[in-house]
A protein has these predicted regions:
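Long, highly charged, low-complexity internal segments
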Residues: 1-13, 121-236, 271-276, 305-425
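C-terminal or mid-to-C-terminal helical accessory/interaction module adjacent to the motor/catalytic core
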Residues: 23, 49, 70-154, 197-204
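Conserved short loop/turn motifs at secondary-structure junctions
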Residues: 39-40, 116-120, 200-209, 219-224, ...
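A generic secondary-structure signal for well-formed alpha-helical elements
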Residues: 54-59, 106-110, 192, 239-248, ...
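Core structural elements
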Residues: 95-107, 124, 152-156, 203-215, ...
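Extended, well-ordered alpha-helical scaffold/bundle regions in very large, multi-domain proteins
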Residues: 226-288
Length: 429
């Protein structure tokens, strides 16, 4: 890179690739037309441009085609719609590449001296390490605080304990120490409890969008225990076998054909009321959206042959894609307030009842369990003023927790939120 000459890059062919280049040049010279079918994003466009340059191709007559899935229809359509190389994408890739080299060449020697030889520092790697270090410092400096929370299991005042009819509720007040908590428990022992209020609110839950590279990596980590690198290796095999669309993408869009096929499948399998066609807006700050979202090439195929990991990942992609085009789930969220006759402290119970399962019939998105449990309890039917008995009331000491260390999934999520890196960089990083 010639920094003094407007950062002009100079490219060299590696010695071990000279034979391949020679063979390609001969094949190109013997051909009437050369078709370049590298990926549609800026990295793929740069590859096409480098090939044209090395093979000394006439850009005006060279056919540039792109497709996002290895199917007969997709390839045929690409051949019918060739275009020229997009130099805007090429220049964009060159700028990123030059920045990568400048950052790496400047920082890596410092690592060799201060840490150990052969370490590398990249534009994305360095930021990822910084995030991990900052989180570790937060954990080290965190000071835990304790309190006591009181929870009770209540049930309607009937002659016997009804099965599956208990209400788990938590006291609205937190107690500073064991002495305060014990005093409150002594107050609860002879107390009379009743339902002082009920709030019922209808609500909906919407499906997650189809997978991008980063969301596939995150969900495969949560649901399947796959590392980021493992996910990309398995996805590559599925793509090369023509089972899924291109696996390096930051788009959540589906093609019109995919939407039609998915809708037909949902109506046939689950009925019209379960179908809701929708497109999702990509949230990533740096999204190129050169491709579709990651989806099955044939939505009607719910399973594939292959290794167990390939089957698992395909099923995950299939379910997520189908669910994204299904109706919202309809829920009823209930809050029950329980009062006591000898204290202003109330107990609160919350629960959720699914009235219509919608997309949940097929798929439910996982989340990083960094903030504790997120269970949805089904509450028994009660009325305001109804007397309640308690089965148990206990006090538990709780400690505030430091922020958790990043997992591979949560680190990828953070990088994406900050607009750092591209789908192709997350696995190597």
């Amino acid at each position: 890179i010639d920094i003094r000459n407007n950062f002009s890059p100079e490219y060299e062919i590696p010695k071990d690739k000279a034979k391949i280049v020679s063979e390609l040049r001969k094949a190109a010279s013997d051909s009437k037309t050369v078709w370049l079918a590298s990926d549609e994003d800026r990295e793929g466009e740069s590859i096409a441009w480098h090939l044209a340059s090395v093979l000394k191709l006439d850009l005006a007559s060279t056919r540039r085609i792109v497709f996002h899935e290895i199917t007969k229809d997709a390839i045929s359509n690409a051949i019918l719609n060739p275009r020229q190389i997009d130099m805007n994408l090429v220049n964009s890739q060159q700028a990123r590449r030059i920045l990568d080299r400048i950052v790496g060449f400047e920082i890596s020697p410092v690592l060799w001296k201060k840490v150990q030889p052969s370490l590398s520092a990249g534009r994305v790697q360095s930021v990822a390490v910084r995030l991990i270090v900052e989180r570790e410092r937060e954990i080290i400096s965190f000071k835990s605080e304790s309190s006591f929370r009181v929870t009770g299991l209540f049930y309607p005042d009937t002659s016997e304990l009804p099965e599956n009819n208990t209400i788990r509720a938590e006291a609205s007040k937190k107690f500073r120490d064991d002495k305060e908590a014990t005093a409150f428990l002594e107050l609860c022992a002879p107390a009379e409890f009743s339902v002082s209020g009920i709030t019922v609110k209808p609500g909906t839950r919407s499906p997650a969008p189809p997978f991008t590279t980063s969301t596939l990596q995150q969900e495969a980590y949560r649901k399947l225990g796959f590392s980021v690198a493992q996910t990309m290796t398995v996805a590559q095999k599925l793509y090369e076998a023509g089972k899924i669309t291109y696996m390096r993408t930051d788009s959540t869009n589906l093609s019109k054909l995919a939407l039609t096929k998915t809708r037909e499948l949902i109506i046939a399998e689950y009925g019209e009321k379960y179908s809701k066609t929708r497109q999702f807006k990509t949230r990533s700050k740096s999204a190129q959206e050169a491709h579709e979202a990651i989806r099955p090439t044939y939505p009607e195929t719910s399973s594939v042959t292959g290794s167990q990991n390939e089957k698992k990942l395909y099923e995950l992609i299939w379910k997520r894609t189908i669910a994204s085009q299904m109706s919202d789930a309809e829920v009823e969220r209930t809050t029950i307030l329980i009062g006591m006759n000898n204290s202003p402290v109330t107990f609160t119970a919350t629960g959720e009842v699914i009235k219509f399962d919608g997309f949940l019939k097929v798929y439910s998105e996982s989340t990083d369990t960094e903030n504790g449990e997120d269970e949805k309890y089904i509450l028994p039917k009660v009325e305001k003023g109804m007397n309640l008995l308690y089965e148990t009331i206990t006090a538990t000491q709780k400690f505030t927790s430091p922020p958790p260390r990043y997992t591979e999934a949560s680190l990828v999520k953070k990088l994406e939120e900050l607009g750092i890196g591209r789908p192709s960089t997350y696995a190597p990083t």
